[in-house]
A protein has these predicted regions:
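Short connector loops at helix/strand junctions that flank enzyme active sites
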Residues: 32, 60-65, 94-96, 113-117, ...
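NUDIX/MutT-family hydrolases
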Residues: 119-121, 130-152
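Acidic, metal-coordinating catalytic segment for phosphate/diphosphate chemistry
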Residues: 2-36
């Protein structure tokens, strides 16, 4: 058996230029945290919706739930309470919110690294809905749930 193998002592693995670059460590938040609230009046079977204005950053003219971004370190239930009040003037208690749905998106208008939206349902609130952000919303109103499509 020979003592010297060919290329003995030379490195076998060699770096090539066609390797994909290593991913950079994530320094910023990977996910934007968002809260939305379905205010549902079960006695009249209506929910509060906002129509986005022509000045809105996206989805102009479309109908939406009261929704908004979480502040750093803010509990998501507090985000829901704050955004609902800022947009509609309605007040809910954090403990009365129930998780209705969670949406994860890989990309969003203000979330190029993805977003997570927690949709809450509220059946108890105080106040009457009003358009508190007319630059962002054309109108705020109660909408009968019978008007919603039943399938997508």
């Amino acid at each position: 058996m020979p003592n010297n193998l060919p290329d003995e002592g030379n490195p076998v693995a060699q770096q090539t230029d066609n390797r994909p670059p290593a991913l950079k460590p994530a320094l910023d938040s990977m996910t934007l945290l968002v809260a939305a609230v379905i205010v549902h009046d079960k006695t009249t079977n209506r929910v509060v919706l906002l129509q986005r204005s022509e000045n809105a950053k996206f989805a102009q003219g479309m109908w939406d739930l009261p929704v908004g971004k979480s502040e750093p370190g803010e509990p998501i239930t507090e985000t829901a309470v704050r955004e609902l009040y800022e947009e509609t003037g309605l007040t809910v208690k954090p403990e009365s919110l129930k998780v209705a749905h969670v949406i994860h998106g890989a990309w969003g208008v203000e979330a190029p690294n993805g977003f997570l939206t927690v949709v809450f349902a509220a059946e108890e609130w105080t106040g009457e809905p009003e358009n508190r952000e007319p630059r962002k919303h054309a109108q705020v109103r109660w909408v009968d749930t019978e008007l919603f499509p039943t399938s997508a």
